Amino acid sequence: MLSMAVQPNINAIAKPSIYQSPKLSLKPFKTPAFANPKPFFSSPSFSQLKKKNNWSLFVAPETISDVAIMGNEVDIDDDLLVNKEKLKVLVKPMDKPRLVLKFIWMEKNIGLALDQTIPGHGTVPLSPYYFWPRKDAWEELKVLLENKPWISQKQMIILLNQATDIINLWQQSGGNLAS
């Protein structure tokens, strides 16, 4: 329920209302539907401001049943002024970015690299390819993971175990993918 105080002003009948509602109009009315306001503050600066502001409320006779006059206040139902609809927004939670171990399987080498996969956006390379047996790819990958403080110890162990498994598979096959 909205509670407001209004001040009578004969000149305001010709002015347009700031509240546009199908039930409120500028038609002449038989029963006055306004009252004198009471100041909220008694400071001198507020009393100067209230002299400049004149408020008026216009109500058509067919809507007087929706308006209740009580003392110096006019109460108007909320649905008279604004019809609000509640909108619901469904937000799908984003998947967390993942760390992915990529590899290139070649006859004489195997390359290992680390990427970050961001769901809905693609991948971000976090390292170049480290090749084994030319260099120790596993050791280079371990140093890279240790230099990234945002990668947890658990993730680091999982990625290094995956790298070990891939290197072992490559060694067992002798670089030949068909065997």
Swiss-Prot record:
Q: Which GO terms describe its molecular function?
A: rRNA binding; structural constituent of ribosome
Domain of life (superkingdom):
Eukaryota
Keywords carried by this UniProt record: Chloroplast, Plastid, Ribonucleoprotein, Ribosomal protein, RNA-binding, rRNA-binding, Transit peptide
Is rRNA-binding included in the keywords of this UniProt record? yes
* Any Gene Ontology biological process: translation
Cellular component terms (Gene Ontology): chloroplast; ribonucleoprotein complex; ribosome
Locations listed in the record: Plastid, Chloroplast
InterPro entries to which the protein is assigned, alphabetical: PSRP-3/Ycf65_sf, Ribosomal_PSRP3/Ycf65
Where it mainly occurs, coarsely classed, is plastid
Q: Which Gene3D superfamilies does the record associate with it?
A: 3.30.390.140
Q: Where is the transit peptide?
A: 1-58
Give the family per the record: Belongs to the chloroplast-specific ribosomal protein cS23 family.
* Role according to the record: Component of the chloroplast ribosome (chloro-ribosome), a dedicated translation machinery responsible for the synthesis of chloroplast genome-encoded proteins, including proteins of the transcription and translation machinery and components of the photosynthetic apparatus.
Give the matching PANTHER family: 30S RIBOSOMAL PROTEIN 3, CHLOROPLASTIC, SMALL RIBOSOMAL SUBUNIT PROTEIN CS23Y
- What quaternary arrangement does the UniProt entry report? Component of the chloroplast small ribosomal subunit (SSU). Mature 70S chloroplast ribosomes of higher plants consist of a small (30S) and a large (50S) subunit. The 30S small subunit contains 1 molecule of ribosomal RNA (16S rRNA) and 24 different proteins. The 50S large subunit contains 3 rRNA molecules (23S, 5S and 4.5S rRNA) and 33 different proteins.
What is the name of this protein?
Answer: Small ribosomal subunit protein cS23
Record organism: Spinacia oleracea (Spinach)
